[in-house]
Curated annotation (Swiss-Prot):
Name of the protein described by the UniProt record: Alpha-conotoxin GeXIVA
Propeptide: 23-46
Note: Negative results: this toxin (both bead (I-II; III-IV) and ribbon (I-IV; II-III) isomers) does not inhibit voltage-gated calcium channels from DRG neurons (Cav1.2/CACNA1C, Cav2.1/CACNA1A, Cav2.2/CACNA1B and Cav2.3/CACNA1E).
Lineage of the species this protein comes from: Eukaryota, Metazoa, Spiralia, Lophotrochozoa, Mollusca
Family as reported in the entry's similarity comment: Belongs to the conotoxin O1 superfamily.
Length: 74
């Protein structure tokens, strides 16, 4: 009986800790932790002027595309 009460109190305490950290993260710019990674790393594919150079503008007539990791033309 005592063990059951201790386990219930522990679970409630850990749940409360999770809820307080979730509220702390939602006060910032990002409402949810999962949105942090998608907001900063997501990029649309850009086109390049020539291969080997860094990507400049999203539109180009030569239709070469950038790598998302290195941001270099392919």
């Amino acid at each position: 009986m005592k063990l059951t009460c201790v386990l219930i109190i522990t679970v409630l305490f850990l749940t409360a800790c999770q809820l307080t950290t979730a509220v702390t993260y939602s006060r910032g710019e990002h409402k949810h932790r999962a949105l942090m990674s998608t907001g900063t790393n997501y990029r649309l594919p850009k086109t390049c002027r020539s291969s080997g150079r860094y990507c400049r503008s999203p539109y180009d007539r030569r239709r070469r595309y950038c790598r998302r990791i290195t941001d270099a033309c392919v």
